[in-house]
């Protein structure tokens, strides 16, 4: 019995142990599972956060790239719009000038037609008067002949002589009327032919008429370069203006720097200098001087290329090299506000077309028209520029007709051929375009600035003189070895007094003396 009880107790204990172990194991399994789940959830949250962070960073990167690309496209669009607006304004201005020119031509044609009608009426009235007079004379002559025939007491020789005299008088009257009629018809025909030739020449040739200004625009890659161009405390701008004699204007216009100077050649040199500095990426006073020296060497090639281009456009390929270089210099001179090279090209084309209409040598007419103002780019002379140009072209064995056309286009000598009249007429047409005479004021301002520079150059020790800010400042560069500081003060005073006595100007003019002393030594 005790054994049975013990067995039952053992079985019961085993059963209790099994149940307890089951529940204890289940508890620990649930505890471990909960921990794993929590760790997994934390890991999932961490992965989600990292993914969100990477997504945000990627989003910010793409947004930044899109913004930069949008800003770039916007700048390009604004620049393109600015260029197109400027081009549209220029085309609109050209169209207005062309319309004004056509209106003037139409008015001239109407005036000529009205004048011809008036002359035709006068001729008809004169013709009627002459006819009445001729009828009256015939009647008188017939009556006189009848009287002579009826007179019997005259000698036969006397009567015959009287009849002959009357017949001669009648023949002379008829001949005079015929000559007068032929002369009037010839004048009318010549007038119509001249008008037709001029109208044909003007209609066949279209020109871009723009008044030369004193500004050049240089485009830069970004506005950040403006700060480098200005330099610390503006030292780069000062060095640039001292080297080139050109005002440099840096304003709020995007990606644009403006150069201002009345001298086109000096302005072109400054433009080449600035482009070299921007290409090198190094901008400081020493680099500016070096770039200006390099640009000075290259400007001759630019000038010669301009002469070659205009000669080729007119198909004049036999012009001497020395003359080609002078034609290139015309690009940097103005006449009544118009570019001198463009003006000469217009005269050449007009003269060529009119010569072709009149069955004359069109090639020689174009050559004479292109070279007619060559004297304006030669060294100054006491003679008129037309005579100076004619004398210069003599050494190239040009024809007498061409030389006379050059020398006579301003009436300084007698015209000896139709070619001279054609060049004179073409020159007058080119200069009488709309707005040409209004540019005389601009030429006067340029001459005033040149005279200010010449006044300052007349003093000893002066190397260079530049008229800046539309003539409100004269900047004088002197030799540092020959002019001391005290002498520089006196020089500024003397130049100012001479300007007051010899020049006419509004307001006041600032005279700046720049004296630089450089000492160089070499260590060996």
Swiss-Prot record:
EC number: 3.1.-.-
Biological process according to GO: mRNA catabolic process
A Pfam family per the record: RNase_Y_N
Compartment(s) of residence: Cell membrane
Classification of source organism: Bacteria, Pseudomonadati, Chlorobiota, Chlorobiia, Chlorobiales
One of the record's GO cellular component terms: plasma membrane
Annotated coiled-coil segments of the chain: none
Main location: membrane
Top EC class for this record: hydrolase
Entry's transmembrane regions: 3-23
UniProt GO MF annotations: RNA binding; RNA endonuclease activity
Membrane association type: Single-pass membrane protein
Domain HD: start-end pairs: 340-432
Function: Endoribonuclease that initiates mRNA decay.
Protein name in the entry: Ribonuclease Y
InterPro entries to which the protein is assigned, alphabetical: HD/PDEase_dom (IPR003607), HD_domain (IPR006674), HDIG_dom (IPR006675), KH_dom (IPR004087), KH_dom_type_1 (IPR004088), KH_dom_type_1_sf (IPR036612), Ribonuclease_Y (IPR017705), RNase_Y_N (IPR022711)
Keyword Thylakoid: no
Family membership: Belongs to the RNase Y family.
UniProt domain KH: residue ranges: 214-280
């Amino acid at each position: 019995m005790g054994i049975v009880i013990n067995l039952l107790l053992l079985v019961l204990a085993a059963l209790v142990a099994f149940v307890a172990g089951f529940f204890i194991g289940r508890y620990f399994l649930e505890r471990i599972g909960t921990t794993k789940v929590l760790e997994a959830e934390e890991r999932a949250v961490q992965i989600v956060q990292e993914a969100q962070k990477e997504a945000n960073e990627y989003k910010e990167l793409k947004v930044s790239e899109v913004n930069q690309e949008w800003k770039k496209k916007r700048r390009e669009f604004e620049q393109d719009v600015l260029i197109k607006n400027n081009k549209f304004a220029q085309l609109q201005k050209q169209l207005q000038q062309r319309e004004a020119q056509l209106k003037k031509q139409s008015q001239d044609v109407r005036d000529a037609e009205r004048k011809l009608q008036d002359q035709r009426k006068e001729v008809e009235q004169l013709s009627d008067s002459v006819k009445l007079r001729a009828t009256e004379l015939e009647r008188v002559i017939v009556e006189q002949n009848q009287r002579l025939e009826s007179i019997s007491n005259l000698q036969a020789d006397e009567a015959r002589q009287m009849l002959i005299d009357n017949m001669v008088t009648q023949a002379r009257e008829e001949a005079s009327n015929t000559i007068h009629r032929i002369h009037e018809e010839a004048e009318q025909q010549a007038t119509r032919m001249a008008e037709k030739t001029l109208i044909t020449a003007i209609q066949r040739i279209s020109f871009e008429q723009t008044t030369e200004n004193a500004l050049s625009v240089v485009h830069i890659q970004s506005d950040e370069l403006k700060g480098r161009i200005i330099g610390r405390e503006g030292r780069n701008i000062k060095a640039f203006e001292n080297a080139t004699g050109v005002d440099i204007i840096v304003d709020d216009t995007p990606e644009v720097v403006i150069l201002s100077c009345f001298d086109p050649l000096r302005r072109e040199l400054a433009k080449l200098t600035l482009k070299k500095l921007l290409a090198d990426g190094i901008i400081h006073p020493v680099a500016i001087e070096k770039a200006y020296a390099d640009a000075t060497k290259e400007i001759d090639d630019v000038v010669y290329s301009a002469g070659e281009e205009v000669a080729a456009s007119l198909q004049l390929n036999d012009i001497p090299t020395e003359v080609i270089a002078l034609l290139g210099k015309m690009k940097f001179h103005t006449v009544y506000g118009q570019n001198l090279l463009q003006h000469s090209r217009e005269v050449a084309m007009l003269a060529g077309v009119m010569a072709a209409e009149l069955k004359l040598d069109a090639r020689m007419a174009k050559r004479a028209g292109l070279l007619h103002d060559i004297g304006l780019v030669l060294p100054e002379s006491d003679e008129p520029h037309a005579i100076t140009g004619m004398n210069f072209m003599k050494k190239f064995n040009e024809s007498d007709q061409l030389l006379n056309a050059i020398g006579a286009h301003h009436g300084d000598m007698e015209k000896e051929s139709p070619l001279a009249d054609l060049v004179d007429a073409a020159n007058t047409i080119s200069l009488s375009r709309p707005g040409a005479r209004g540019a005389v004021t601009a030429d006067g301002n340029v001459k005033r600035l040149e005279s200010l520079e010449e006044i300052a150059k007349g003093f000893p020790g002066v190397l260079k003189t530049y008229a800046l800010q539309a003539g409100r400042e004269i900047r004088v560069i002197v030799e540092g070895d020959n002019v001391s500081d005290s002498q520089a003060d006196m020089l500024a005073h003397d130049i100012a007094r001479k300007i007051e006595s010899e020049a006419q100007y509004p307001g006041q003019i600032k005279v700046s003396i720049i004296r630089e002393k450089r000492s160089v030594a070499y260590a060996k």
